Structures are given as C-alpha cells and as structure tokens.
C-alpha cells in the first residue's frame, strides 16, 4: 500500500509540474543536454527556488561530469523541499558518486525510516552498506527485496555488483543475466557482464544488443551501456573496426 501510495503521489506531482519542465524532461530524455540546460537555466532565472528545475539541472550536471554542481543543486533542493523523497534519493546517489558515503548513508537511513516499506529506498540502503564493505549484509537485503519483486532489474544488477565485488563471479553473471532477461533494454546488465572482462557473449546476446540500439525509445544511458558492451563483445570476436565504432558512439553520447 505504501509503495502504491508513493507512486500515486509521484504521478500527481508530475501532473502538477509546469508544461515547460515536462518539455525540458522530454528533451533531456532524447539526450539533448545543451538545449535542456539552456531552457532549464532560463526557467530558474524566473523561478530560482523551483526544486524540479534544480533537479533537472543537477541531472544534466551529473551527466556532464560536474558532480560538485549536481550535489550543490540537490542539497539546496532538499533544503527547499525536505519532504520530497525523490529529491533525497537523487541527492543520495550524487553523494555516493562523490564518495561521500557517510552523508549518503544518512540520507538512506532517513528514507528507510520514513518509508519502511519502499523497496527502492531499501535497495539504496543495501548499496550504501555494500559501499561500506559489508557485502554479505547487502546481498541479504537484495535477496529480501527480490522475494517481493523477483524480476526487478535494478536490484538484480545491484546484487550482481555485490557478488562480483565479493569475489563470486559465477553467481554475479547469473544475476546480471536474470536482470537483462527481466528487462531486455536494461543496458547496465549487459555492460556489467562486459565489465567482468572474462565473460564471452553468445552470438544471440550480441544480436539482442544490436537490436536494442535500433529502438528509438531507448534511454540514452542504456544506449551508452549497449555501445560499450558491444565494443567489448566485438573486440573479443576480432571485429575490431565495428568494436571501435561502438566505443566512439558510446563516448559521443556520454
């Protein structure tokens, strides 16, 4: 019930946003960062405390590698709207990227205490525990989440990361494969397999990745993951020119 209520609140929140912010989100979805950034900055000049605009601008900053700016924007957004759980989650993720693990843990603890049945926030807590080196505890939490949501690709991928770091590559591979079986356009799962540096993709998996890149609705982050995974897979097959092409395309989007 709590998860459904949270989802309903988020839907109502999105419906309440100005049309211009929804439009900027669509532009960002298409990977047009420069255009989205300009429009977002112009909007913030008129409404400097709009937390959704700050959140969008932080996403752009994060994609461009300006994590300090992203953190600053989200910290202020959370201060302006402390009850917005999604803002806190985004703030937590940026803190993690900046390796500010103690601050990230505080945000995870707050979210889990405030929304004890929210599986997404529980997964964020597991990731923070993993970052602190307690891989067994993190895997236990991921497993508890998967009992309730067995096909959640993000949790399966995160569990794979924990298993990999814990030195259990075979179970990690299984977890990554379950993730991309559950959601074929989940590029991170394929990239994670490539990132093992020991995995050999099957021909069918290479074909699947190429087909996913033909999907015009594929998220830009997933597109990057697929290009990089294909670069690894094709290089291993001796298709060096095609592999380099995918590497270039991935870097262009990134």
Regions found by a protein language model. Give the residues of each.
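Alpha-helical solenoid repeat scaffolds of the TPR/TPR-like class and their adjacent stem/linker regions
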Residues: 1-254
């Amino acid at each position: 019930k709590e998860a459904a209520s949270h989802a309903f609140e988020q839907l109502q929140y999105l419906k309440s946003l100005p049309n211009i912010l929804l439009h900027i989100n669509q532009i960002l979805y298409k990977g047009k960062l420069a255009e989205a950034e300009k429009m977002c900055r112009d909007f913030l000049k008129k409404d400097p405390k709009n937390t959704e605009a700050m959140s969008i601008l932080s996403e752009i900053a994060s994609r461009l590698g300006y994590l300090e700016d992203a953190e600053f924007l989200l910290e202020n957004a959370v201060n302006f709207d402390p009850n917005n759980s999604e803002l806190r989650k985004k703030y937590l993720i940026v803190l993690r990227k900046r390796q500010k693990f103690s601050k990230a843990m505080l945000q995870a603890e707050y979210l889990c205490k405030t929304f004890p049945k929210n599986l997404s926030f529980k997964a964020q807590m597991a990731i923070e525990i993993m970052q602190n080196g307690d891989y067994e505890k993190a895997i236990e939490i991921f497993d508890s989440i998967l009992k309730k949501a067995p096909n959640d690709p993000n949790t399966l991928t995160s569990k794979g990361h924990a298993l990999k770091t814990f030195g259990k590559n075979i179970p990690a591979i299984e977890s990554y494969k379950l993730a991309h079986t559950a959601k074929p356009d989940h590029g991170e799962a394929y990239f994670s397999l490539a990132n093992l540096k020991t995995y050999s993709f099957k021909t069918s998996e290479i074909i699947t990745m190429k087909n996913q890149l033909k999907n015009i609705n594929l998220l830009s982050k997933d597109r990057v993951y697929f290009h990089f995974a294909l670069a690894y897979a094709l290089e291993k097959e001796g298709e060096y020119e095609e592999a380099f092409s995918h590497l270039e395309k991935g870097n262009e989007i990134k």
